[in-house]
Amino acid sequence: MDEAAAAEAVQLIDGEGEFAADSAERFMAAAGVAGCGLSYAVVSIMGPQSSGKSTLLNQLFGTNFREMDAFRGRSQTTKGIWIARCVGVEPCTVVMDLEGTDGRERGEDDTAFEKQSSLFALAISDIVLINMWCHDIGREQAANKPLLKTVFQVMMRLFSPRKTTLLFVIRDKTRTPLEHLEPVLREDIQKIWNSVAKPEAHKDTPISEFFNVQVTALPSFEEKEEQFREQVQQLRQRFSNSIAPGGLAGDRRGVVPASGFLFSSQQIWKVIRENKDLDLPAHKVMVATVRCDEIAHEKFSCLTSDAEWMELESDVQSGPVPGFGKKLGYIVDVHMQEYDKEAIYFDEAVRTAKRQLLKSRVLNLVQPAFQKMLAHLRTRALEKYKTELNLTLESGKGFAAAVRDTTESNLNEFDQGCADAVIEQADWDYSKILEKVRRDVEDHTLSIREGKLSELTNHAKEKLRKALVEPVESLFDAAGPSTWASIRNLFKRETEAILPEFQKNLAGFEMESATSEGMVSKLRDYARSIVENKAKEEAGKVLIHMKERFTTVFSHDKDSIPRVWTGKEDVRAIAKDARSAALKLLSVLAAIRWDEKPDKIEKILTSTLLDGSVTPKSKGASASSDPLASTTWEEVSPKYTLITPSQCKSLWKQFKAETEFAITQAVSTQQAHKRGNGRLPPPWAMVAIAVLGFNEIMTLLRNPIYLFLLFVGYLLVKALAVQLDINREFQNGVVPGIISVTAKLIPTLQNILNKVATEQQQQQGHHQDAAAEAPQQQQQPQPQPPPLLLSPRSPMSELRRPLHMPFSPVRKAVSPSPSSSSSTVTSPRNAGEDQKPRQMVQPDNESNNAYSIV
């Protein structure tokens, strides 16, 4: 602090009553008053104009107030209120020099500023010096009486006034001792106090409640300057430690902290200028409110720009910060302590309230960082839980035990991390984030649990599917009386091998027995559904299977060798056996049989369909007499019905229609074989032919061309008869047969001739190539067949080859129509029609008849 600058007087309020805030702020900064807290005192001086007030202050406190120049005349020197700091006196003492009263410049009637300045001095001063002349003591019309009356009057305007020390300084003391002057002065003061109108609350209040009255005397400065200076120095000693108990202002009340002195003074003067009653307690609260707000705002700004806080905030954005709670708590505590240090002297209630607001703002500022820290801890806890759980499960530990141990350790670690992140200044509750972490762990555990259970279930299902699908399909392909018994045994064997292993794996999850049994039951139901779905799939292709079974039995013997229809076979019996085998297959696929209870499906189908009792025996028989005129099987649950009785009846009709061709073909083949291997005509017929046809025979022998033409004609007619299937065409009548044969005759004849010509050209080409390449050898020439003779491999023989192929129906899978949902069998008739073989009738057996002409 620059003492010279501090002692320099600064105008606080000018002569017009305007508060000089700028110059006052410069004074406060230069004098260092703001940092004194409550350890400062304010001294002001009142008195008549030109009574030596400024001189006394300069001598007493070492200030530099402007003094009157007596050589220029007696006039007003101090205008308004001036302020300076006392040099060399502790505690810090601020001195105010007020404009003198009773000055001719303002006039007798202009006392407004006088009263306002007096009230201002009483409101902010701890000690008020009353400068008065010694010769005025005891006078009725003394110059000091209006001043005292003014002081006492304005004191009444102070609501709950503070106690102020009034130090009467008697100037130009005479020979009368002070001991005699003081009682007279006090008596005059009491009279003036009694004469002042007071509120009812203070009507009988003694002056000592408002003022601490003290009296001192000083000799004349002009006449006894040395003595004056000595006594002034003695008086100066009384201002040392003036605010300490027993000092001049030891019992002062309502002190405003030094940092709020300037603002308080400005607001008090504003109220006084508005001619309002001055409520000092309320003013004290107001000053405390404003100053505490300023201090709090300043400390909050300091926190926002604090380098440590900015670094901590930046670090926590990228990841968890070790020791976050301690670091953040230290930063907050530093700034809160600075607030407490500066605001400690203000009103406690206001200070505490503003501190709470500052604390709230600070916590709101730093809480996002705390929440970010918790978010990092939450993420880290969940990731660590996932990793540790996977490692624990991989080690072979049971799922429930692994979850229990891992959850407990990670939640405890997270709870400890949250506790370390909390600062002492806040009562942040992290139970919600802890609950969120718990839910995260539970959700992840549930997800892993469902995944593990699903994995176990899918693995068991896959094993069941592999164990059941192909064997069941194979059993259905070889359907027989024991098919369902074999399926039941297979189902029991595989489920008893797979389900216990599955149940053992579930033990590690420590689930309730009802839940475990439910999962095993569902898996068993899944195994049943595999069999049932396969049965439904095969039932949808039952017509194909029936035709395949029929073809296998009908076209092959008991050694599985293809049959050759030589005419010795009983086609009727073989066909009945083949149809019976197909009917048994139909009965197997008609219903699902999970129990060992026998049913009558095969018996009903055999008696109704195979024995030919599909239709009623008499016209009067009702539909109810037909056992297949129903949608359910007796003693079979509808849900286990694959093919209803009515569907079986429809399938059987379609099956018979589509297999009738194979039977007819077999019969035709037998007949052709018999015709091809028939005996020669009877002897009498041969004799008759020789006698009656002797001339014709001789003609043919004499002219071989006729014989050749006859042979060629025979072959053509024979080929046409085979191709046109004359016998079959005439089964529907003579006229339709003639029309049909006539329509097919010319195209068939053209095809035969084209075939013969092509085969002859190919054979001639082969002979020429062989003759050109073969070397000359000494061999007997091989006799070549005449061109008019046909070998077993002749073109005509090749032409007949497709007619002797054995019956082999094409197997084609039938895809169920999406629109058919009411029946297990999907469009059996259409499926059968798609599978109908397209073959020619075989009138002969090529293996036994080559039709060679030598």
Swiss-Prot record:
Enzyme Commission (EC) number: 3.6.5.-
CDD domains xrefs: GBP
Coiled-coil features, chain-numbered ranges: 217-242
GO molecular function, one term: GTPase activity
Entry's transmembrane regions: 681-701, 705-725
Keywords: Coiled coil, Endoplasmic reticulum, GTP-binding, Hydrolase, Membrane, Nucleotide-binding, Transmembrane, Transmembrane helix
Region (Disordered): 758-854
Binding site for GTP: 47-54
Subcellular location: Endoplasmic reticulum membrane
Keyword Amino-acid biosynthesis set for record: no
InterPro entries, per database record: G_GB1_RHD3_dom (IPR030386), P-loop_NTPase (IPR027417), RHD3/Sey1 (IPR008803), Sey1/RHD3-like_3HB (IPR046758)
Biased composition (Low complexity): 758-781, 814-828
Biased composition (Polar residues): 842-854
Cytoplasmic side: 1-680, 726-854
HAMAP family: Sey1 (MF_03109)
Functional note: Probable GTP-binding protein that may be involved in cell development.
Protein family according to the UniProt entry: Belongs to the TRAFAC class dynamin-like GTPase superfamily. GB1/RHD3 GTPase family. RHD3 subfamily.
Protein name listed in UniProt: Protein ROOT HAIR DEFECTIVE 3 homolog 1
Organism the protein comes from: Oryza sativa subsp. japonica
